[in-house]
Amino acid sequence: MRDIKTYLSVAPVLTTLWFGALAGLLIEINRFFPDALAFPFF
């Protein structure tokens, strides 16, 4: 039971950190390469 409680307390923290890092990465990509729906360098 202790392992389940540890998992339930760690998983939300890790997903919050992961989605925060992913959102930051996407924001930085959009800052340096705006309008990425049209890739003009292909």
Curated annotation (Swiss-Prot):
The chain crosses the membrane at residues 7-27. The keyword Plastid applies. Keywords: Chloroplast, Membrane, Photosynthesis, Photosystem I, Plastid, Thylakoid, Transmembrane, Transmembrane helix. The keyword Transcription regulation does not apply. InterPro entries: PSI_PsaJ, PSI_PsaJ_sf. One of its GO terms (cellular component) is photosystem I. It is found in: Plastid, Chloroplast thylakoid membrane. Pfam families: PSI_PsaJ. Its main location: plastid. It is a single-pass membrane protein. GO terms for biological process: photosynthesis. Belongs to the PsaJ family. May help in the organization of the PsaE and PsaF subunits. This is Photosystem I reaction center subunit IX.
